[in-house]
């Protein structure tokens, strides 16, 4: 644990959560568009 840079992990966590948030919004947008256009 001492060899890991402590400043690196929160940045990766924020990028991962941001990626999953955008992916979730994209999937919801596709589902809603399929509902509306059907």
From Swiss-Prot:
The chain crosses the membrane at residues 17-37. The keyword Cell membrane does not apply. Keywords: Chloroplast, Membrane, Photosynthesis, Photosystem II, Plastid, Reaction center, Thylakoid, Transmembrane, Transmembrane helix. One of its GO terms (biological process) is photosynthesis. It is a single-pass membrane protein. It is found in: Plastid, Chloroplast thylakoid membrane. InterPro entries: PSII_PsbL, PSII_PsbL_sf. It comes from the Eukaryota. SUPFAM superfamilies: Photosystem II reaction center protein L, PsbL. The keyword Transmembrane helix applies. Pfam families: PsbL. Belongs to the PsbL family. One of the components of the core complex of photosystem II (PSII). PSII is a light-driven water:plastoquinone oxidoreductase that uses light energy to abstract electrons from H(2)O, generating O(2) and a proton gradient subsequently used for ATP formation. It consists of a core antenna complex that captures photons, and an electron transfer chain that converts photonic excitation into a charge separation. This subunit is found at the monomer-monomer interface and is required for correct PSII assembly and/or dimerization. NCBIfam families: PRK00753.1. PSII is composed of 1 copy each of membrane proteins PsbA, PsbB, PsbC, PsbD, PsbE, PsbF, PsbH, PsbI, PsbJ, PsbK, PsbL, PsbM, PsbT, PsbY, PsbZ, Psb30/Ycf12, at least 3 peripheral proteins of the oxygen-evolving complex and a large number of cofactors. It forms dimeric complexes. This is Photosystem II reaction center protein L. The lineage of its organism: Eukaryota, Rhodophyta, Bangiophyceae, Cyanidiales, Cyanidiaceae.
